[in-house]
């Protein structure tokens, strides 16, 4: 199973290369590293710094790129991106992390319960067997 961080990084790479080509994307990553001290590999862990750096470089174009990234990311997770007033790129990533953590916790809990029920049924059958 792919982590959210890995998926986000792949989506950022793909979107940037589609819009700015390979060379332009390298220039942007270099800018982020030199001006925001943000390495490409850190984008998923530091989305607010990524967003701030993109705004420094691209101005009003940054939110357009961020929205493209978010739409693709949500699509790959089979979720619908809900735009909210006052929400920024980093807010969406933070909320997505929470949603996925809740879903993971739910799946683990259900798995434990199902396993417990199976074990109880096996135990009941063993008691019945002479």
Label the model's feature ranges.
Residues 1-130:
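Long, compositionally biased intrinsically disordered regulatory segments in eukaryotic proteins
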